[in-house]
């Protein structure tokens, strides 16, 4: 259910945070666009109002944010950030911000395209109160930085990224630490990602995620909508192994194998 809680104390706290971030938005805004390149996308409100997604455009709860031939980054009042590549659609389905962090919540639906999610460093929204959904899975946050690519069929590729101390291109032998951990869950099972560049593919909501694999020599600039079409070899192998397991079990996969 959509929900937004902004009492007087909360609105004051939001205004203070937005001032600190260097951008002043409307009282109901929960963040705003702070980077944009290429063709501007759009922000659609529940009222039907459509805004151009350009720098300093405010973001409100329940907004649908969609890019065209361009990219943008959004920063929320708790410093959570999402980065959208071309032709990406994200729905902000819930944002409850309260001066008491335990009462704050965030939920988003990554509908299509490629989005990178990084939780805020202020701890204003507890990670356990953040939920990201795709058409085929629910992502529980116990980490801070990951990407999701969703194709036109809803298939989702989820990658846990390293911590902020790693460069854009990092070789695993350099000892890159993960940004935390995330769970990927659907009707077929649950998988936990807890290594830098660890990834899973989720084909349908009823089919369990593939076994986690580590993507070697990954350049973060490669992660866009083509990444799910031209899949990494590690993901292709994981999908083939899953198909073989399904055949061997007569279509029933033993989820204990995913631990």
Predicted segment positions?
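N-terminal post-signal-peptidase region of extra-cytosolic proteins
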Residues: 46-62, 66-71
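Short N-terminal segments immediately surrounding and downstream of signal-peptide cleavage
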Residues: 27-45
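Short, small-residue-rich packing micro-motifs
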Residues: 65-74, 83-137, 180
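Short, solvent-exposed loop/turn positions at domain surfaces
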Residues: 53, 59-61, 78, 126, ...
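Glycine-centered tight beta-turn/hairpin loop motif at sheet-sheet or coil-to-beta transitions
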Residues: 46-48, 77-79, 136, 188
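C-terminal interaction modules
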Residues: 1-29, 50-54, 68, 85, ...
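Flexible, membrane-facing loop/turn or short amphipathic-helix motifs
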Residues: 43-48, 76, 120-123
């Amino acid at each position: 259910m959509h929900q937004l809680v902004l009492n007087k104390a909360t609105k004051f706290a939001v205004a203070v945070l937005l001032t600190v971030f260097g951008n002043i938005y409307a009282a109901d805004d929960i963040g705003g666009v702070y980077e944009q390149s290429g063709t501007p996308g759009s922000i659609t409100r529940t009222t039907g109002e459509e805004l151009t997604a350009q720098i300093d455009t405010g973001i409100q709860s329940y907004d649908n944010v969609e890019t065209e031939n361009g990219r943008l980054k959004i920063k929320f009042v708790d410093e959570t950030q999402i980065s959208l590549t071309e032709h990406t659609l994200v729905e902000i389905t819930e944002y409850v911000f309260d001066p008491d962090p335990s009462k704050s919540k965030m939920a988003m639906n990554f509908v299509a395209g490629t989005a990178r999610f990084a939780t805020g460093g202020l701890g204003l929204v507890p990670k356990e109160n953040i939920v990201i959904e795709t058409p085929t899975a629910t992502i529980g946050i116990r980490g801070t930085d990951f990407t999701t690519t969703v194709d036109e069929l809803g298939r989702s590729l989820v990658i846990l990224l390293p911590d902020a101390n790693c460069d854009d291109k990092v070789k695993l032998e350099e000892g890159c630490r993960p940004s935390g951990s995330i769970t990927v869950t659907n009707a077929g099972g649950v998988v936990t990602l807890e290594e830098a560049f660890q990834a899973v593919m989720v084909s349908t909501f009823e089919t369990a995620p593939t076994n986690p694999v580590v993507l070697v020599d990954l350049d973060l600039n490669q992660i866009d909508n083509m990444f799910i079409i031209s899949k990494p070899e590690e993901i292709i192998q994981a999908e083939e192994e899953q198909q073989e397991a399904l055949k061997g079990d007569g279509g029933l996969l033993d989820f204990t194998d995913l631990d």
